Amino acid sequence: MKDKFELVSKYSPQGDQPRAIEQLVAGLKKGLKHQTLLGATGTGKTFTVSNVIQEVNKPTLVMAHNKTLAGQLYSEFKEFFPNNAVEYFVSYYDYYQPEAYVPQSDTYIEKDASINDEIDKLRHSATAALFERRDVIIIASVSCIYGLGSPIEYGEMLVSLRVGMEISRDQLLRKLVDIQYDRNDIDFQRGRFRVRGDVVEIFPASRDEHCMRIEFFGDEIERIREVDALTGEIIGEREHVSIFPASHFVTRPDIMKKAIVNIKAELEDRLQVLRADNKLLEAQRLEQRTNYDLEMMEEMGYCSGIENYSRHLSLRPAGVTPYTLLDYFPDDFQMVIDESHVTMPQIRGMFNGDQARKQMLVDHGFRLPSALDNRPLRLEEFEKHINQIMFISATPGPYELEKNPDVIEQIIRPTGLLDPIVEIRPIQGQIDDLMDEINNRVEKNERVLITTLTKKMSEDLTNYLKEAGVKVQYLHSEVKTLERIEIIRDLRLGVYDVIVGINLLREGIDLPEVSLVAILDADKEGFLRSERSLIQTMGRAARNENGRVIMYADKMTDSMRNSIGETERRRKIQIEYNEKHGITPKTIKKEIRGIIAATSAADEREAVKQHDLSKMSKKERDVFIEGMEHEMKEAAKALDFERAAELRDALLEIKAEG
């Protein structure tokens, strides 16, 4: 079993990275449960964490607050650890519209999803790696706290094969069917097997290129070979191979029988309650739907939405903590929470959001109460899984600071870039003053971000600047994801010089061309003008050597004082380090596509605006459909189920028309 992490990099730790690494490692070796790394933007936090992982040498779970960030971290860790198992575990849905009921309009929306096969493969690869080795880093989104099948069943049902092992060909085939592999001699792909005489070829669920060829002599395995599934080329000989289940929700036939008995008993109890409350329509609906699911489970071994019966399938009592990816790790694993000021509130809030939606389905007879146990972890359940944890953030939140107030700092950027200079100017005459600043920046081919507090002020300011001849765009919450990507990209390209918005903290706004961030109404205390938000907003100017922040305010609030004090403190440390080491700050040069996940749809922006499908070319039509699919996913993410369902139906119509 491979168990040593090996960090590969042409860089060595610089600035205050060595001290941060040393402190984090010492804390972990001392047995500290919670540690926080306060790392300013662009200081190389991932490299620091990689050094810690190598030094401590334990299986590691790195959690991020969305798929995009998880993808970036996966690429970075893969580069740092090419000889170890760096795995990726995020939701495998490209699009996920959860089952929902809207009582106001009596609208039931069925679950609808499209599964990404590549991500499904990576999820299987991640769980398999945890059973086979210790040098494992799994990069996961918060979806890793959602219910997953039992790791005990998963481990016990794996099929272990060795050369010389006595097992008949037919016994092996039965075992493969039990772990949800399909026989298909023609269309051979992941999660399938094929048979040719005394040779069985198995395509593991965690692979997409190589399969295993098992050769029998009578009732004995004579040879095991790894084969290229496409070309048939022999990759190598194997003495032993483990075939993991093709689904994380594997259920043995004997357990399925018990589960069906328990589901029927729960259904009877629930029907009595509904009828006693005179909810006859709900009772009829529940009886019809559940009996249909039970028939499918008896005949086929599964049904649509089988995860809603997961508590019965694992024979757990009501309310018990569900199994998740965290249960697949060994007891001594360590956790890293990236952007913890965002990720921890997300972990805290996931249970409540999930329960509110499911409770509606239970109340109106769409689901049995046991569906409530197919859920994400509560915060206190998540905490019980923690062995040792490191929080990483430029602005740690109250949760992290409460767990361990002794924060480890990483302030120096390897590029020498400083935190921006912050100025406070009076509100009176702020627009004229802002115009002068914008003109100065435009002359130098630099960009400006302006943040306001209200939608009306953003709109009025944008219109005023447009009339004054400024190339400006307003970025508000109603701007769709694709459009947002285009606007940010166009700011970098110089189509716009200024972006006005309310919340400019969202991902994708770290732009090297931005040398000025203007904060209007900086003295109005609240979420968008809190100390943490102000530090994050000011950080948007930290990628440019001429970075500057102007706060327009008539009084100094505690949030302003603290955020300015923190920025000046960091700046002083950075200047001293640069002077001591002869470093001159230089603006980061980034490829336009490097910072933003630009898509083909963003390249075809004009085509998307054409709504007459009959006049579109195939390429334009494909782009239009892609744009609609993005909008549908965003609507589902925002819990706007009705809008997502409308878009889904419209897409089906368009696709049906050919």
Curated annotation (Swiss-Prot):
Domain named Helicase ATP-binding: residues: 26-414
SMART domains: DEXDc, HELICc
UVR domain mapped to chain residues: 622-658
Similarity field: Belongs to the UvrB family.
Motif (Beta-hairpin): 92-115
Chief location category: cytoplasm
Pfam families linked to this entry: Helicase_C, ResIII, UVR, UvrB, UvrB_inter
Transmembrane segments: none
Known partners and oligomeric status: Forms a heterotetramer with UvrA during the search for lesions. Interacts with UvrC in an incision complex.
GO biological process, one term: nucleotide-excision repair
Subcellular locations according to the entry: Cytoplasm
GO MF entry, a single one: DNA binding
Helicase C-terminal domain ranges (all copies): 430-592
GO cellular component, one term: cytoplasm
Entry comment, domain topic: The beta-hairpin motif is involved in DNA binding.
The protein, known as: UvrABC system protein B
Record keyword Signal present: no
Protein purpose: The UvrABC repair system catalyzes the recognition and processing of DNA lesions. A damage recognition complex composed of 2 UvrA and 2 UvrB subunits scans DNA for abnormalities. Upon binding of the UvrA(2)B(2) complex to a putative damaged site, the DNA wraps around one UvrB monomer. DNA wrap is dependent on ATP binding by UvrB and probably causes local melting of the DNA helix, facilitating insertion of UvrB beta-hairpin between the DNA strands. Then UvrB probes one DNA strand for the presence of a lesion.
Binding site for ATP: 39-46
Statement: the UniProt record of this protein carries the keyword Nucleotide-binding: yes
InterPro entries listed in its UniProt record: Helicase/UvrB_N (IPR006935), Helicase_ATP-bd (IPR014001), Helicase_C-like (IPR001650), P-loop_NTPase (IPR027417), UVR_dom (IPR001943), UVR_dom_sf (IPR036876), UvrB (IPR004807), UvrB_inter (IPR041471)
Keywords: ATP-binding, Cytoplasm, DNA damage, DNA excision, DNA repair, Excision nuclease, Nucleotide-binding, SOS response
Listed Gene3D superfamilies: P-loop containing nucleotide triphosphate hydrolases, UVR domain
